[in-house]
Amino acid sequence: MRAHGVAFCPASGRQLANLRAVLGPGIDDGPVIPENGLFSLVGGVELHSDPMTREQAVRVIDAVRQVHERGGDVGAVVATRHVAYVERTDEAFTSQVSTYYASREAVRDLTELALDDVLKIAVYDFGVAERDSGPQIRQVVPDLQTVASGLHWTDVMSTVGSKGRALSIIQEHLGVSPEQTAVFGDYLNDLELYDRARRSEEHTSELQS
């Protein structure tokens, strides 16, 4: 693709380290949108980031703890640019987190971290996220957006962040128009990408699930 002047840009809810592990280090040569669009890079150079505040991060962490105390089987992943932090270390939770976070660290108390570079907090629910933990967390943090990124995952993040916003920043940087952009998506967290492209392909069965 590159030889034909086409820039391939993976846009994912996964962390940058995980995308490198899955797609190879060659992704650093072009545009990349990790963490649901909370930051973007071209050629390994960061173009933008949309972190949450420390106060917001603490509220989300406390909300997840409260869901757990009420019987919800949930766990939080505090995602920064390069490392994801967790409190839960049981095998069941770790096996889910390791799929998407290649660079991670377990800590005793997430609120003891600096929390000055939190892009998002991903919440894994062993039940159905949108039915169980999602609505409870949404009530506690109305100033943040909660995005369903899978049957079991909810991403809590800045209200301005999205894959669509990240793509628009990359397009402006590269001088690429929506007419020159094709988008391929498979879940609800891909929807805003379609606003930035005139060519798109969606897997509707998955988008509606």
Which stretches of residues belong to each language-model region?
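Conserved small/polar residues in nucleotide/adenosyl-binding loops
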Residues: E202-S209
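Short beta-strand scaffold positions
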Residues: P10, P34, V183-G185, E202
